[in-house]
Amino acid sequence: MTKILGIESSCDDTAVSIITENREILSNIIISQNTEHAVFGGVVPEIAARSHLSNLDKALKSVLKESDTKLTEISAIAATSGPGLIGGVIVGSMFARSLSSALKKPFIAINHLEGHALTARLTDNIPYPYLLLLASGGHCQFVAILGLRKYKILGSTIDDAVGEAFDKVAKMLNLGFPGGSEIETRAKFGNSHKYKFPKPIINSGNCNMSFSGLKTAVRTLIMSLKEINDTVVNDIAASFQFTIGEILSSKLQDAIRAYEQMINNCDKKNIVIAGGVAANKYLQEILSSGAKTYGYQLIYPPIHLCTDNAAMIAYAGLERYNNKLFTPLNFCPKARWNLEEI
C-alpha cells in the first residue's frame, strides 16, 4: 500500500502526517506554538524555526506510532518547501530531504498554497476544475483550479491578507492569539451594524481585494473611543466580521464571473474555501449563500484541516507521486512561491 509522509513547517505549527493511496489519514499530528508566540502578539520567525527543529523528530515518532507504520513502509516524503517563513521552511524541507536520502525514497517539494488548494480533494474527492478562495493569515486570493499544476490566479489582495487583518484587529482589541477565532467568538455577542467600516475597492470590477484600509479604520475608531468595555469590543468584532463578509461576498461574485469565462459547460459547479479563515462559521454561511445564488456548492474542509496541517501536504504529495512528479534533493526552499509558477 502506498503511504505518503507529509511535513509542514511554513509558519508556527509543526505538523507531520501519513496518508494512504485511498486518501485515508492514518495520523495527523500538529504541535502548536501558540503559547510561545502569544506573549509577542504574533509569530516570531526565529522562535518558530527553532521550535520546528526540536518538534519535528517528536512529531514524526508520534505519527509512526499512531499509524502503526515503519519508516521503511513510507513510499515518499512530501514537505512544504515554500512559501512561508523561510527559517521554518528550510528546517522542514531539510528534515524531509534527509529522510528521503537515508530511506532512498522520493522527495516531493510541495507549495504550501497548493496543499490548501487540494485539501477538498482529500476530504470530499471533488473533481477538477473548481474555484478556490484561499484565505489565510498570509494569503487571500481567488484561484481557478483547473488540474494538478494548472492554477490560474483570478485576483488577490493588494495589501494585507484577510487572516492578518483578523489577527491585527484582535490585537487592537487586546484579544488572544491567534485572533481569528477570538474575533468570531466575540462577534456572536455583538451588533454587526453598530459601526460602519469601509469596504476598499469593492466596486473595482475585478477580483482583487484590499483589507489595509479596513484595518486602519478599526484602529482609528478604537483610538477615538473614550471607553472600551466588553460591549464595545463585541460590537467592533461583529461589525468588522460583517464587513469582511460583505467584501468577500462581493468579490466572490466577480470571481465566479471570471471563472465562468474561463470554464465552459462544467457539470460540477464547486467553490472551495480553504486556509485558516475557512474555519470561520459566519463566513462559511455567508459565502455558501452567495454560492447557491449562482448555482454553486461551497465546500470547506473540516476545521482541523482548514488551518495549517501536514495531511494536506501529504495529499498534494500523493497526487504528484501518482504522476511520478518527484523533486531533486538539491531543490532550494522558497520564501515566496506563486501558485502559477509550480
UniProtKB/Swiss-Prot annotation:
Q: What cofactor does its activity depend on?
A: Fe(2+)
Enumerate the residues binding substrate: 134-138, 167, 180, 280
State the top-level EC class.
transferase
What name does this protein carry? tRNA N6-adenosine threonylcarbamoyltransferase
> Catalysed reaction(s)?
L-threonylcarbamoyladenylate + adenosine(37) in tRNA = N(6)-L-threonylcarbamoyladenosine(37) in tRNA + AMP + H(+)
Kindly list the positions annotated as binding Fe cation: 112, 116, 308
Q: What is the role of this chain?
A: Required for the formation of a threonylcarbamoyl group on adenosine at position 37 (t(6)A37) in tRNAs that read codons beginning with adenine. Is involved in the transfer of the threonylcarbamoyl moiety of threonylcarbamoyl-AMP (TC-AMP) to the N6 group of A37, together with TsaE and TsaB. TsaD likely plays a direct catalytic role in this reaction.
**Keywords linked to the UniProt accession:** Acyltransferase, Cytoplasm, Iron, Metal-binding, Transferase, tRNA processing
Q: Where in the cell is it found?
A: Cytoplasm
Superkingdom, taxonomy of origin = Bacteria
Main localization of the protein described in the UniProt heading: cytoplasm
The record's annotation in Pfam families points to: TsaD
Q: Which residues form a coiled coil?
A: none
